[in-house]
């Protein structure tokens, strides 16, 4: 068996920044540091931060007064921000700047009085945060669609004053079909100046397409609640390559590799490289020989830290 590694894989700039915000807050202010929702969707990362003093909660009513709160990389609604401000909580915002970009688009559409359609997965925290940016007090509305069937059933108030945005971690192929359906049904619909699906999601999906065409089985290192990790698994399966979403080496099963010559490995944007190395080591122990990494698109993007948490230059 030969191992091929996707490139790029694993942490993106938004995840790096979110984790570093929690780490720096713990260093500067000491525990406990409260984090609304898992800062990123990865069990290993969350457990590591919890061991260092981060306290993960789902709602602000679980947060005592006079503590530091961090908003997760997925973003929050205006109502959550307003509640934190009302209570005077000290907040550090780890929302990915590319999610914030989508939030600003929704706010702009709301101010313009345009109805808005969000393409995304119901119940995902990013979707909840984005939906919560829209102010319907001016008579507008925001709608959520997941697929072409939802578009077929959707009724809006004014199809001539309409715009769409998307969740940042969707399948590019699936989303393009939904956008085509929206444009067909609502010819006047507007959209973002630039694709809302983030660069890291696009790059990792492109890498999986290449990897799935060259391997007999694909492993995606990522947690079950990670949207972008699930999309990677689905993409490989759609190409006819058996694919498995795993938290780490402990999830591997011998029977997946019977008669297999090429094993592809990638990792979702929330999964650290240490988990990938653990998978590689386990496969080597089971007889895998050789390891290559695909040529990939370089990722040089970084996002700035909140001023109060920046490391001072020596």
UniProtKB/Swiss-Prot annotation:
CDD domains: lytB_ispH. Its EC number is 1.17.7.4. This is 4-hydroxy-3-methylbut-2-enyl diphosphate reductase. Its cofactor is [4Fe-4S] cluster. (2E)-4-hydroxy-3-methylbut-2-enyl diphosphate binds at residues 41, 74, 124, 168, 226-228, 270. Binds 1 [4Fe-4S] cluster per subunit. It is an enzyme of class 1 (oxidoreductase). It catalyses: isopentenyl diphosphate + 2 oxidized [2Fe-2S]-[ferredoxin] + H2O = (2E)-4-hydroxy-3-methylbut-2-enyl diphosphate + 2 reduced [2Fe-2S]-[ferredoxin] + 2 H(+); dimethylallyl diphosphate + 2 oxidized [2Fe-2S]-[ferredoxin] + H2O = (2E)-4-hydroxy-3-methylbut-2-enyl diphosphate + 2 reduced [2Fe-2S]-[ferredoxin] + 2 H(+). Belongs to the IspH family. Dimethylallyl diphosphate binds at residues 41, 74, 124, 226-228, 270. Pfam families: LYTB. Pathway: Isoprenoid biosynthesis; dimethylallyl diphosphate biosynthesis; dimethylallyl diphosphate from (2E)-4-hydroxy-3-methylbutenyl diphosphate: step 1/1; Isoprenoid biosynthesis; isopentenyl diphosphate biosynthesis via DXP pathway; isopentenyl diphosphate from 1-deoxy-D-xylulose 5-phosphate: step 6/6. One of its GO terms (biological process) is dimethylallyl diphosphate biosynthetic process. Isopentenyl diphosphate binds at residues 41, 74, 124, 226-228, 270. The active site is at 126 (proton donor). Keywords: 4Fe-4S, Iron, Iron-sulfur, Isoprene biosynthesis, Metal-binding, Oxidoreductase. [4Fe-4S] cluster binds at residues 12, 96, 198. Catalyzes the conversion of 1-hydroxy-2-methyl-2-(E)-butenyl 4-diphosphate (HMBPP) into a mixture of isopentenyl diphosphate (IPP) and dimethylallyl diphosphate (DMAPP). Acts in the terminal step of the DOXP/MEP pathway for isoprenoid precursor biosynthesis. Gene3D superfamilies: 3.40.50.11270, 4-hydroxy-3-methylbut-2-enyl diphosphate reductase, catalytic domain. PANTHER family: 4-HYDROXY-3-METHYLBUT-2-ENYL DIPHOSPHATE REDUCTASE (PTHR30426:SF0).
């Amino acid at each position: 068996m030969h191992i091929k590694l996707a490139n790029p894989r694993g942490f993106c700039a938004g995840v790096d920044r979110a984790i570093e915000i929690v780490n720096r807050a713990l260093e500067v202010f000491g525990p406990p540091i409260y984090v609304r929702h898992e800062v990123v969707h990865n069990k290993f990362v969350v457990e590591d931060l919890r061991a260092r003093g981060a306290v993960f909660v789902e709602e602000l009513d679980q947060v005592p007064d006079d503590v530091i709160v961090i908003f997760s990389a997925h973003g929050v609604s205006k109502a959550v921000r307003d509640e934190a401000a009302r209570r005077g909580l000290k907040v550090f915002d780890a929302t990915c700047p590319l999610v914030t970009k989508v939030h600003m688009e929704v706010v702009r559409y709301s101010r313009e009085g345009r109805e808005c359609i969000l393409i995304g997965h119901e119940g995902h925290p990013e979707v909840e945060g984005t939906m919560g940016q829209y102010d319907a007090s001016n008579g507008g509305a925001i709608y959520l669609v997941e697929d072409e069937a939802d578009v077929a059933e959707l009724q809006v108030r004014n199809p001539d004053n309409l715009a769409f945005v998307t969740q940042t971690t969707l399948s590019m192929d699936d989303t393009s079909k939904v956008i085509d359906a929206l444009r067909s049904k609502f010819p006047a619909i507007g959209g973002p100046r630039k694709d809302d699906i983030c660069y890291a999601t696009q790059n990792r999906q492109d890498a999986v397409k290449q990897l799935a065409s060259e391997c007999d089985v694909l492993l995606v290192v990522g947690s079950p609640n990670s949207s972008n990790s699930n999309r990677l698994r689905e993409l490989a399966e759609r190409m006819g390559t058996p694919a498995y979403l795993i938290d780490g080496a402990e999830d591997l099963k011998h029977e997946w590799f019977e008669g297999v010559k090429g094993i592809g490995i990638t990792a979702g944007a929330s999964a650290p490289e240490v988990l990938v190395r653990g998978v590689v080591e386990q496969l080597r122990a089971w007889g895998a020989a050789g390891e290559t990494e695909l040529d990939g698109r370089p990722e040089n993007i970084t996002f700035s830290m909140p001023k109060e948490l920046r490391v001072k230059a020596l």
